[in-house]
Swiss-Prot record:
Organism whose genome encodes this protein: Buchnera aphidicola subsp. Baizongia pistaciae (strain Bp)
Coiled coil (residue ranges): none
Site feature: Important for electron transfer: 730-731
Active-site positions on this chain: 437 (proton acceptor), 439 (cysteine radical intermediate), 441 (proton acceptor)
List of residues binding ATP: 9, 15-21, 55, 91
GO molecular function: ATP binding; ribonucleoside-diphosphate reductase activity, thioredoxin disulfide as acceptor
Catalyzed reaction equations: a 2'-deoxyribonucleoside 5'-diphosphate + [thioredoxin]-disulfide + H2O = a ribonucleoside 5'-diphosphate + [thioredoxin]-dithiol
Name of the protein in question: Ribonucleoside-diphosphate reductase subunit alpha
Site positions (Important for hydrogen atom transfer): 225, 462
Record site feature (Interacts with thioredoxin/glutaredoxin), residues: 754, 759
Function description: Provides the precursors necessary for DNA synthesis. Catalyzes the biosynthesis of deoxyribonucleotides from the corresponding ribonucleotides.
UniProt xrefs under Pfam families: ATP-cone, Ribonuc_red_lgC, Ribonuc_red_lgN
Entry-linked InterPro entries: ATP-cone_dom, NrdE_NrdA_C, RNR_lg_C, RNR_lsu_N, RNR_R1-su_N, Rrm1
One biological process term in Gene Ontology: deoxyribonucleotide biosynthetic process
Length: 761
């Protein structure tokens, strides 16, 4: 019957269907793959054909037929579906399978105002011919189906109204490289462009969404994370709101420190009126966050930070839950509770926590971050001052409420502010850490703005990227990769534009980077070690020692070449203090691996030449970009050997790397009996990482009596994380049984890990 069907071609011409042509394309897409049935894909497709069907719909039907066959027994369908999609995208972009040459493509795209004019200004035609020779378009065939769909949905330049695609992946990679090294000397820039292109197009380095989606376009804002602090006055609150709108519209995820805002009922202007409290202003922030999508790529998102001793804490902890009414809930942001040693001590000793409005207790709020001894002294003093409004609550009640809300929403995060400042890249006396970002991996100094043009405020930005651990042949590879990644991200800081002066001043003075990892689960599987039993501890120590060492060394080399960052004196590195000096020594009880690299030589070099960047490392979530690299997410264990990830492009099946060879080596999330092994590994990483880690906790209620997670277990894991020096905790994942109908190795995963915000890669 199909032989008599007519089809409408892309050019509008109608002709008889050519099944031989379809089979030729299917044969091409299946070449070299195992366990593929071309006839099965053809059969599944043809039953959906109809008269006058468009050839574009035929192509999409074939792609879906192949993608639906991705399974445990036939994982190679992910590559067949990917190749068919690449073919389809190239036809949409170029009208043919073979891409044009780079120079003609760039000229055309600049004419269409899709690419930045500087590409033609900075590079003569001869350079484009050289860059064109670097491009390996066949690398498009290394993408998995999930990767190609993410490219299509988020990263390739397109008209989001008409769905017109304008480029292919290799053009994206070469032009990102060209943009980043455009100001390098003529004699070296082609070398760096080629090396960086090779590293990103072969998935050795993973780039964040703002860079992948925007770098090469006229829009120049590529920092993934923005940290904004609000003061306790209307001018500052409104300046914060303005800053949020500007950055959300430009692809950034937001961290908002609202901890200074005074409590409900506090006096204003010596009692002229009473304060409305935090919630109305949180709603104000929420409206700003949701006012824009992030450059058409994803919706805005933010995390708000406040201390556990805030007078309104009981109302703030429940803002995200589904109970209550609209007036007393602010559900469309996430929240992070700030803790320190004194608060944990009150819990352990069965004592009370006293709640204050920050406006009533001079210097308490600032000392909470920059001086723990002073904080404890002032806190006890104010507890005994009968003239100050306060409320005493049992520490066990407050921690239980916090952990209950963390469990029910999954999105109440933890920041240990003392660890953030004692094990910091920054000197807390000069540049204290008072908040984190959307996903809790960034710890940078901030200062509230009084208006959006305030030169004295500080909005902190962090530019992210990640090393693909699965691509390493050995730890020596990290030297070259670190050099490339530090140079590239440092160039981003000079290349991008800054909508707010205080952000520009901070970014160019501190030059902070956050370089993390992807594919850690594959790295463990490849090395035959596991999350849960301690077998990965020493490997993790050696790996993250090498990562931080080589990143610092690369930044020091760049400082010799271009100068140290202007505010290098604000860092502990300036004093010769390294992460290996300030980590929580309890880590030594779980890992006795010695240091293997010459840290004393590095210390001398840093003291002599400085660093180009105030910070180098942060371990972020990477749900989307890890799919591009066909890698596992960040440091997380996979939920299944084949995960079905819900995204706006539909259900995407992603297979773990080297499934056939290593399927018995992977330790899946819900097969890990408890959080202890994971928290130990995270603490070993934190020993070296100079910012923080988006570390999660995970619970399967079926492992506990009556299918209920005991509060004692939740608190125990929280205390373990603190004892081992973790600065932050991100999501709490609770197994809900939604995936029980799948086979053991196929798990659903909502693509929510930092899905709306850009603080992931």
């Amino acid at each position: 019957m199909n032989q008599m069907l007519f089809v409408t071609k892309r050019n509008g011409k109608i002709e008889l269907i050519n099944l031989d042509k379809i089979h030729r394309v299917l044969n091409w897409a299946a070449k070299g793959l195992e366990n593929i049935s071309i006839s099965q894909v053809a059969l599944k497709s043809r039953i959906q054909f109809y008269n006058n069907i468009k050839t574009t719909i035929i192509h999409e039907t074939i792609i879906k037929a192949a993608a639906d066959l991705i399974s445990e027994n036939s994982p190679d369908y992910q590559y067949m579906a990917a190749r068919l999609t690449i073919f389809h995208l190239r036809k949409k972009a170029f009208g043919q399978f073979n891409p044009p040459n780079l120079y003609d493509h760039v000229k055309n795209m600049i004419k269409l105002e899709k690419y930045d004019q500087h590409l033609l200004n900075d590079y003569p035609k001869q350079d484009f011919l050289i860059m064109n020779s670097f491009i390996k378009h066949r690398r498009d065939m290394n993408f998995s189906y999930a990767a190609v769909k993410q490219l299509e949905g988020k990263y390739l330049i397109q008209n989001r109204v008409t769905k017109k695609i304008y480029e292919s992946a290799q053009f994206l990679y070469i032009l990102i490289s060209a943009c980043l090294f455009s100001k390098y000397p003529n004699e070296t820039r082609m070398k760096y462009i080629k090396n960086f292109y090779d590293a990103i197009s072969t998935f050795k380095i993973s780039l964040p969404t703002p860079i992948m989606a925007g770098l090469r376009t006229p829009t120049r804002q590529f920092s993934s994370c923005v940290l904004i602090e609000s003061e306790d006055n209307l001018n500052s609150i409104n300046a914060t709101t303005s800053a949020i709108v500007k950055y959300v519209s430009q692809r950034a995820g937001i961290g908002i420190n609202a901890g200074r805002i005074r409590a409900l009922g506090s006096p204003i202007r010596n009692g002229d009126t009473l304060h409305t409290g935090c919630i109305p202003f949180y709603k104000h922030f929420q409206s700003a966050v949701k006012s824009c999508s992030q450059g058409g790529v994803r919706g805005g998102a933010a995390t708000i930070f406040y201390p556990i001793w805030h007078f309104e804490i009981e109302s703030l902890l429940v803002l995200k839950n589904n109970r209550g009414i609209e007036e007393n809930r602010v559900r469309h942001m996430d929240y992070s509770v700030q803790l320190n040693k004194l608060m944990y001590q009150r819990l352990i000793l069965g004592e009370h926590i006293t709640l204050f409005s920050p406006s009533d207790v001079p210097n308490l709020y600032d000392s909470f971050f920059n001086n723990q001894e002073k904080f404890e002294r002032l806190y006890i003093k104010y507890e005994n001052d009968k003239t100050i409004r306060k409320k005493k609550v049992k520490a066990s009640y407050l921690f239980s409420l916090m952990m209950q809300e963390r469990t029910s929403t999954g999105r109440i995060y933890i920041q240990n502010v003392d660890h953030c400042n004692s094990h910091s890249a920054f000197n807390p006396k000069i540049a204290p850490i008072r908040q984190s970002n959307l996903c809790l991996e960034i710890t940078l100094p901030t200062k509230a703005l009084q208006d959006v043009h305030d030169k004295n405020g500080e909005i902190s930005l962090c530019t992210l990227s990640a090393i693909n651990l699965g691509s390493l042949n050995n730890l020596n590879d990290l030297s070259k990769l670190s050099n490339l990644i530090v140079r590239a991200l440092d160039s981003v800081l000079d290349y991008q534009e800054y909508p707010i002066l205080s952000a520009k001043k901070s970014a160019l003075s501190r030059r902070t980077l956050g370089i993390g990892v992807i594919n850690f689960a594959y790295y463990l599987a490849k090395n035959g070690v596991r999350y849960s039993d301690g077998s990965a501890n020493n490997l993790t120590h050696r790996t993250f020692e090498a990562i931080q060492y080589h990143l610092l060394n690369a930044s020091c080399v760049l400082a010799q070449e271009k100068g140290a960052c202007h505010w290098f004196s604000h860092t502990n590195y300036y004093k010769g203090i390294l992460p290996i000096d300030t980590y929580k020594k309890n880590v030594d009880e779980i890992c006795n691996e010695p240091l293997h690299l010459d840290w004393e030589l590095l210390r001398k070099k840093i003291k002599k030449y400085g660093l180009r960047n105030s910070t180098l490392s942060a371990l972020m979530p990477s749900e989307t970009s890890s799919q591009i690299s066909n890698a596992t997410n960040g440091i997380e264990p996979p939920r299944g050997l084949i995960s079905i990830k819900a995204s706006k492009d539909g259900m995407l099946r992603q297979v773990v790397p080297e499934y056939k060879r290593l399927k018995n080596n992977y330790e899946l999330l819900w097969n890990i009996p408890n959080n202890t092994g994971y928290l130990q590994l995270a603490s070993i990483m934190q020993k070296f990482v100079d910012q923080s880690i988006s570390a999660n906790t995970n619970y399967d209620p079926k492992l506990f009596p009556n299918n209920k997670i005991p509060m004692q277990q939740l608190i125990l894991d929280l205390l373990t994380a603190y004892k081992l020096g973790l600065k932050t905790l991100y999501y709490q994942n609770t197994r809900d049984g939604a995936s029980d109908h799948q086979t053991e190795d196929i798990q659903f995963s909502k693509n929510e890990n930092c899905n709306h915000g850009a603080c992931k890669i």
